[in-house]
Amino acid sequence: MAGRRDRSQQLRGSRIAIAILIGIFIGCVCAVLFPYGFFNSSSSLKASEHLSKSSNQVGSSACESPERVKMLKSDFVTLSEKNAELKKQVRELTEKLRLAEQGSDNARKQVLALGTQIKAGPFGTVKSLRTNPTILPDESINPRLAKILEEIAVDKEVIVALANANVKAMLEVQIASIKRVGITNYLVVALDDYIENLCKENDVAYYKRDPDKDVDTVGKTGGNHAVSGLKFRVLREFLQLGYGVLLSDVDIVFLQNPFSHLYRDSDVESMSDGHDNHTAYGFNDVFDEPAMGWARYAHTMRIWVFNSGFFYLRPTIPSIELLDRVADRLSKAKVWDQAVFNEELFYPSHPEYTALHASKRVMDMYEFMNSKVLFKTVRKNHELKKKVKPVIVHVNYHPDKLNRMQAVVEFYVNGKQDALDSFPDGSE
């Protein structure tokens, strides 16, 4: 009996010991997981302050000394700073994730726009995509302009010319040629009141922009080149509204409807400043450097520039990006808009520079004729003079623009065979 009692007492003692150990263990776990108690930090601090006051009242300063309170406050500040840093890191990671998802979404949208993936066909049958999808029109950009374009545009296309009082005489010749051909989708962007009144008198569709200090200053007083540079800012809204735009300088005579001669397979379709097949359409120019010996000949690809006074833009993202790039550079430096226009179109991507990925086409140089081709080549060649009737003639190579424009009308419209003869090839 005594042995059983002893064993029973030992067993009871073991259970008590185990219970104590479990309690200590749970207490340690709770101390680690909840160092400031089961309530929030503010409640803990209030409780700590309350206990501190109580302990001071009962004289138990040894348990909650001022040093202990300072240490707890210091720990709280440290943890708060760490928490703020973690929140900052979370925000940064969230932003990076958002940007990554945005980039992925853009890539997905581009794939959807271009179509599903396909396998390459047999040799000689593969053709790359050069016609980018058009944008979704946004009439909220400019409701007033949208209404005008809706009334005059044909198949969502329009000819646009910018003009101020300085080019009145040339504009009158151009308007007469437009009416003679029967083009109805022609719009003048009037840069001053004088041109606005001229358009009203001649029953020509016009658009006058809302007041803009930067544009108005150049538009009302600027010369030919200054006004020409404005088009890259003005045309953006036309594209955003979903219209194909054929930009025309005022020193151009229309002899046929140009819309019947466009291909519309590229973002940019422009006339050339070239005067023959090589200069207009490109050629391999060999650079000779004798000092290099065996490697003295270096091949270079050359083409004369696209003319920024007559070009067609489809309403695509690359076309709008082209306008943005050129307008941005023109706003920062005094440079020629035609030079910038071509640099953005032709310079390839390289370190520190990402090129514009716009498809481009050069127009037929005899249909969309510059004045060098006309006065230096065509008028001196009997066959060309007889057979070639251009769509437009752009008097871009000569300063006596008005006289030559009138001569073009006399020759091609009125049939006066010697109308072009009195002019020199170039300028005197």
From Swiss-Prot:
InterPro entries reported for this sequence: Nucl-diP-sugar_transferase, Nucleotide-diphossugar_trans, RRA1/2/3
Keywords associated with the record: Cell wall biogenesis/degradation, Glycoprotein, Glycosyltransferase, Golgi apparatus, Membrane, Signal-anchor, Transferase, Transmembrane, Transmembrane helix
Cellular compartments annotated: Golgi apparatus membrane
A GO term from the CC aspect: endosome
Residue ranges that the UniProt entry lists as topological domain Cytoplasmic: 1-15
Keyword Amino-acid biosynthesis: no
UniProt record, GO biological process: cell wall organization; root hair cell development
Motif (DXD motif): 249-251
Carbohydrate-modified residues: N40, N277
Principal cellular location given in the protein's record: Golgi
Pfam families: Nucleotid_trans
Enzyme class: transferase
Free-text disruption phenotype from the record: Reduced root hair length and content of arabinosylated extensins in root cell walls.
Membrane topology: Single-pass type II membrane protein
GO molecular function: glycosyltransferase activity
Membrane topology, Lumenal segments: 37-428
Segments crossing the lipid bilayer: 16-36
Protein family: Belongs to the glycosyltransferase 77 family.
Job description of the protein: Plays a role in the arabinosylation of cell wall components. Involved in the arabinosylation of extensin proteins in root hair cells. Extensins are structural glycoproteins present in cell walls and its arabinosylation is important for root hair cell development and root hair tip growth.
Domain comment in the entry: The conserved DXD motif is involved in enzyme activity.
Name of the protein in question: Arabinosyltransferase RRA3
UniProt organism field: Arabidopsis thaliana (Mouse-ear cress)
